[in-house]
Amino acid sequence: MKVLSALCVLLVSVATAKQQLSEVEYRNAFTNWMIAHQRHYSSEEFNGRYNIFKANMDYVNEWNTKGSETVLGLNVFADISNEEYRATYLGTPFDASSLEMTESDKIFDASAQVDWRTQGAVTPIKNQGQCGGCWSFSTTGATEGAQYLANGKKNLVSLSEQNLIDCSGSYGNNGCEGGLMTLAFEYIINNKGIDTESSYPYTAEDGKKCKFNPKNVAAQLSSYVNVTSGSESDLAAKVTQGPTSVAIDASNQSFQLYVSGIYNEPACSSTQLDHGVLAVGFGTGSGSSGSHGGSQSQSAGSDSQSAGSESSQSESGSQSQSESGSQSQSQSGSQSFSGSLYSGSYSGSQSGSQSGNSGAAVKQTGAGSGSGSGSGSGSGSGSGSVSGSASGSASGSASGSSSGSNSNGGVYPTAGDYWIVKNSWGTSWGMDGYILMTKGNNNQCGIATMASRPTAVASL
């Protein structure tokens, strides 16, 4: 994880620099990103992915220079277009405009803060992979929390998303093509339970038949309640009682490339909802994704995906690529970065050679500076090498370390009211798999438009 942290610091600082990047800088950033995320491209695919990466890097640069509380970066989705991202990881938008949009008459203390991760009610971040089964992860997350609370805060058990994908089709869900959390709750209620993750593991694809086994049931639901549509105060009341399933608009490029801070996207829709997630708390003022026991542990499955393939995340590794021409370079120096949310420094070195379209050999040494996001200080070192030929092979490795701290004990500081939302894209996305979404901001992204919280049967 140390190498990835160091590389991420470098990539974010390059991406936030207020200057036009050279082709060499783009290529260096892409090479480092490929090594960190262990990407493998065919010769036919490489140039297309590189151009998409450059466009995403430009978008990140432009966004971050505006000083938003939302910080973007070159995360696990940096090599796919927004169209690919929506088609692969999101469901078909559900039109919730017909839902009654009224404010709840419940009175709620807006100063209160809740984080169910600190109560042991949230399982580690999971990864849906290239399957549009987000609804199943939202459902299991809410059910896991409900069962844990019904059992007196004892025995948190990870539940099977594959059980829901394979077996709830008759209720209206469509596996990897999408579904609704309420329909999944109905299935669990009528089915008298859902199996454990360990007994019915996730495959990231539609199963050919339902393999539910009542002997492996680890949770049962008695009912569920819907949040008053559009009411964030009612959503807060429900989240105070336990983790709550919510549907949101996650279609924007800013959501795709989110890395930290409070997510605030005015272009978000409150009625066109395409992603199921889990609200596990809310807060105000300085907040973070936090590190609360198991909730921040490595998830089941891989953290790194690209269009058409999946690979596992690691701190060092190698990959292949193909281009025409050749290019070699070596670089050493230091990188500094500062911003309203993050201040610190990165130092390190890298060297290598890679194939490239320019056919020119370039060597450079020096230091660079940029701006970034976060709070604290960090230092790290890294080295990497890439070699390639016209036939299209390349290998690379990276090693290094980084360290950092800030006033919040090493976490990203933010300001404002926010929802703590658990996603299902692995720990390489967002803040260790979480996103902080703006709260009390006109139901932005539809956070309270279509939300539900289940109630579990005790003593399971």
UniProtKB/Swiss-Prot annotation:
GO terms for molecular function: cysteine-type endopeptidase activity; cysteine-type peptidase activity. It is an enzyme of class 3 (hydrolase). InterPro entries: Papain-like_cys_pep_sf, Pept_asp_AS, Pept_cys_AS, Pept_his_AS, Peptidase_C1A, Peptidase_C1A_C, Peptidase_C1A_papain-like, Prot_inhib_I29. Residues 1-17 form the signal peptide. Disulfide bonds join 131-176, 167-210, 268-445. Residues 367-385 have a biased composition (Gly residues). Its EC number is 3.4.22.-. Belongs to the peptidase C1 family. Keywords: Disulfide bond, Glycoprotein, Hydrolase, Lysosome, Phosphoprotein, Protease, Signal, Thiol protease, Zymogen. Residues 18-111 form a propeptide. It is found in: Lysosome. Residues 294-359, 386-409 have a biased composition (Low complexity). It comes from the Eukaryota. Its main location: other. Glycans are attached at residues 226, 252. Residues 285-409 are annotated as: Disordered. The keyword Nucleotide-binding does not apply. GO terms for biological process: immune response; positive regulation of apoptotic signaling pathway; proteolysis involved in protein catabolic process. Pfam families: Inhibitor_I29, Peptidase_C1. The active site is at residues 134, 275, 423. GO terms for cellular component: extracellular space; lysosome. This is Cysteine proteinase 7. Glycosylated; contains GlcNAc-alpha-1-P-Ser residues. Also N-glycosylated. Gene3D superfamilies: Cysteine proteinases, Cysteine proteinases. Chain C.
